[in-house]
Amino acid sequence: CKADEMGALVRLNSFEEIAEGWQALLSSCAIDTVFFTPQWQKVWWQELGQQKEMLLLSFQPEDEITGIAPLKRENGVISFLGDRDLYDYADFLVRKGHEDSFYNALLDYLEGEPWERLELFSLSQDSCTLTHLAPLARQRGYEVEVREEDVVPGLSLPESWDAYLSSLSRKDRHELRRKLRRLSSETEYRCYTCSSPDELDQDLESFFQLMAESQEAKSRFLTPE
């Protein structure tokens, strides 16, 4: 964090005010997933943000945006935009090296707002919110509770299928090949690749339809109502 960096969070009225800078900031954040993109956040807000107050905050102490706080307020509780069902991860967007200045500015801003509880769900275990905001809040006298919410499995895939097979144990490789042979012999299946942007919308509809047919729970989830 720059020792001489000063600044305050600015509240925005729309995603359009910050969309370009938001997209540029993502590549400088510790975590960059689709859930943090302005497109994802905007669609969620437009479709599911009813009865909530948006607190979209930008931190720009110099000429570039170094932090964004995508928050909402409802019944005295401030939390991230989104919800646990549609977001694997949620967090503040903070440029690396600016964590202390951003989180101090965030606490300064929140101290001037009406709220009873700050609930930050779906943080990854290595989130800088846990390593920076939690201790800073405790220093200011806030009661902070950190709980494990859930476990998200993940795997860093190698560059090729052969490399992936090589990473498996001999037993797992044998089992995978056995299942692939069974799939080929007992069912009629095809692998589809969408290579044209013009076909994407139609292919996505087909994909969602297959998801809905695979499980009743998924069908209920994908029902517009």
Give the residues covered by each predicted segment.
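Conserved GNAT acetyl-CoA-binding A-motif
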Residues: 114-123
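Short, Lys/Arg-enriched N-terminal segments with co-localized hydrophobic residues
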Residues: 1-5
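A conserved beta-strand-loop-helix scaffold within acyl/acetyltransferase catalytic domains
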Residues: 7-83, 123-152, 156-225
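A gly/proline- and charged-residue-enriched helix-loop-helix capping module
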Residues: 85-115
